[in-house]
Amino acid sequence: MALSPLAPSEFPAIPNVQGVQLAVHASGMRYSGRDDLCLVVLSSGSIVGGAFTQSLCPSAPVDWCKKVIKGGSARTLLCNAGNANAFTGKAGQEVVESSAISLAGLIDVNPEDVFLASTGVIGEPFPPSDLVEHLPELVGKLQEADQDNWLAAANAIRTTDTFPKGSFAKINGTGAVVAGIAKGSGM
């Protein structure tokens, strides 16, 4: 696939963000030989906000996040690339619930503080074990967020994207850094 003409010449040097840990892992669910799971762990007391699709048919992870965001706190975000877990019915809900409960147990948080995202093909259910069996190894790879693992995380969430996307901003005079990765537009 050709690199998008919108691709920057290099990935931004996203700084370490205190209280954020990242990990990536190759589950092999869809892709061979590349990371397709991304885990973000946030320090206790982190607050979450969200904007969700207006689709009448959101994915199972979107339904989960709409439900748990009402609590206002977040400790983790788990994203898998390759399967959107959309139009998967009860099977998709089981993947979401199993993933949240398993991950919460591994890092000692409440399942309601686990946020999930999936990207990829639509309408292909998969068993919860395809994702859950990789969580212990993924958790074992957690490291403080730095320039290298921000890039690895941005690459792990890619599907048909031709380049990884990330950005950050320092809030003047506060020492605060807002950082993020994305996928999609300008792929």
Q: How would you label these PLM feature ranges?
A:
Residues 1-53:
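N-terminal amphipathic/basic leader segments beginning at the initiator methionine
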Residues 44, 67, 82-84, 119-121:
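Short, ordered loop/turn segments at secondary-structure junctions
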